[in-house]
């Protein structure tokens, strides 16, 4: 009997080794990993530069608290500020914690309380994260929710009309590609309406880049595809290539809202995490690296569209190396079949197969994955005729 709370529906796979795009389980079986910790190991498992940076830091100092100066934090913050729309950075431990910090910052900086988010969004499982999330299923049994959140339809430029002259809006918070909501990209028209609404209401724009950031979509941050100017950006997942870390990035005019004692964390920004972040960002923010990731994403999408001609496949969508295959029915059996074939993927809702390979994936590995997907979908279609 397990001593763990049963909060996860775990597969019967125990990963013992991982390198690059491949993992090996307890039985010695090798899998092509197109999950990568759910968009975490963007440089692939156990990337040499990140591994060496963390090993080196292990022999120096791990943690001393944020009462002390931290040059590694400063270096990482400067990298994030140089490659984003923000100027100031707060380091934490996870995406949920980053989104909590963003919500606190927005309310404190504006003196207003209402936060606009969107249906099918996902912003975490803490109380502010749940309240911001536009999916009732994750809130069941945990009420009452934190107040002040209003939900609008995603990808509907006219949705803001429903708010009328409503004021006291601190921020609009959204993902430019909804991950847990089905790998659902926003349209340029919708995002333009979001930016205009924020300007009209003098509300802050918070972009949740937890899953889309750090090169995942072929840009440093997904909002760059649309010319947006966010006031606050949240990142985590790929930020440390597997080391737990998150960050809130904000414009300099928000600095007065976060002063000593207003917000904090014990472990956030510890030296081990910062070693991983600095090594990761040093690679990801190279222009050639991002262009290669974008090219690989385009190649993967082209291969999927060329090979997955089954009537069961309704749409292939996403950006960069964050793609979803929407199917005409549940995909759980296909995902299980793919595990048998040696390919790890995950769902994004009941009918969507989500693909999150590392940004270092090769074209041969992409071809291997597409071949397995084609085989599994064909088998599913034959069995369910």
Curated annotation (Swiss-Prot):
One Pfam family cited in the UniProt record for this chain: Aminotran_3
GO cellular component: cytoplasm
Subunit relationships: Homodimer.
Protein known as: Acetylornithine aminotransferase
Catalytic activity reported: N(2)-acetyl-L-ornithine + 2-oxoglutarate = N-acetyl-L-glutamate 5-semialdehyde + L-glutamate
Pathway: Amino-acid biosynthesis; L-arginine biosynthesis; N(2)-acetyl-L-ornithine from L-glutamate: step 4/4
EC number(s) reported in the record: 2.6.1.11
